[in-house]
A protein has these predicted regions:
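S-adenosyl-L-methionine
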Residues: 1-47, 57-64, 85-112
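Conserved beta-strand/loop positions that form the S-adenosyl-L-methionine
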Residues: 51, 74
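Class I SAM-dependent methyltransferase "Motif I" SAM/SAH-binding loop
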Residues: 52-56
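Conserved SAM/SAH-binding beta-strand->alpha-helix loop
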Residues: 77
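A short glycine-rich, Lys/Arg-flanked "PGG" loop and its adjoining helix->strand segment in the class I
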Residues: 137-151
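Conserved beta-strand signature within the Rossmann-like core of class I S-adenosyl-L-methionine
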Residues: 152-159
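Class I S-adenosyl-L-methionine
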Residues: 175-223
Length: 223
């Protein structure tokens, strides 16, 4: 792999080239094609996937809480993911990996029925109707998630936008997912504490007084 020297971009260190160089060089980061070429031991180790992970900090915190699981934070923007990647390296958290890829590529990146959990945290709601197909809870994506989850595996969603959250619940029910846990105000609920691990967006919305919706759903006979 070609080494990119972040110091070449030191004058513009707040810009994307500097952050992309850091992502490129991190041992726990993979471009889409690099992940596809990784050893089976690496690719098949993943048990929890976060789609649209942003900085990946949510996955880092969950990985710290669950050292026996292997987490993958996936996002199309490597300049964002590098933040979580370097935080994990600095803290010695080795059970979280970072993949730069689009959400619609996950079927190529992970084996069928290989994941215990799949997290979607504060995705773009794409409020315009003509953009509904881009929502990460659109039926097209839900069918992909179903193929990736193990029997009994869970899909979890957190969001502050009530309209998007309710629309997502409708899609889950329509696609015959079973709602196992649900709250329209996560941080005032009795749901597990790990669900309340904060993302950067979550901290922002809560500071503005917004309630966070959270749902866990399964397919088939999952619990």
């Amino acid at each position: 792999m070609t080494y990119l020297d972040p110091q070449q971009f030191i004058i513009t260190r707040k810009r994307k080239k500097y952050r992309f160089a850091k992502f490129h060089n991190a041992a726990n980061c993979y471009e889409c094609d690099e992940w596809c070429q990784a050893t089976p031991e690496v690719r098949q180790s993943a048990t929890v996937l976060e789609v649209g992970a942003g900085t990946g900090m949510f996955s880092v915190e969950l990985a710290a809480q669950h050292p026996d699981e292997v987490f993958v934070a996936l996002d199309v923007k490597g300049d964002r993911l590098q933040k979580g990647a370097y935080t994990a390296l600095e803290r010695g958290i080795t059970n979280v990996l970072f993949v730069r890829a689009r959400a619609d590529q996950i079927g190529e990146l992970f084996a069928a029925h290989s994941l215990k959990q799949l997290w979607i945290t504060f995705p773009d709601p794409f409020p315009k109707r003509r953009s509904a197909g881009r929502r990460l809870t659109h039926p097209t994506f839900l069918r992909q998630y179903e193929q990736l989850l193990r029997p009994g595996g869970s899909l979890l969603l957190k969001h502050d936008d009530r309209d998007f959250f309710c629309w997502s619940l409708e899609q889950l029910v329509t696609q015959e997912w079973s709602i196992r846990e649900l709250s329209f105000d996560l941080h005032e609920s009795s749901l597990p504490d790990e669900y309340k691990t904060l993302t950067a967006y979550e901290q922002r919305w809560m500071s503005e007084g917004k309630a966070i919706g959270c749902v866990r759903a399964t397919t088939g006979n999952g619990q």
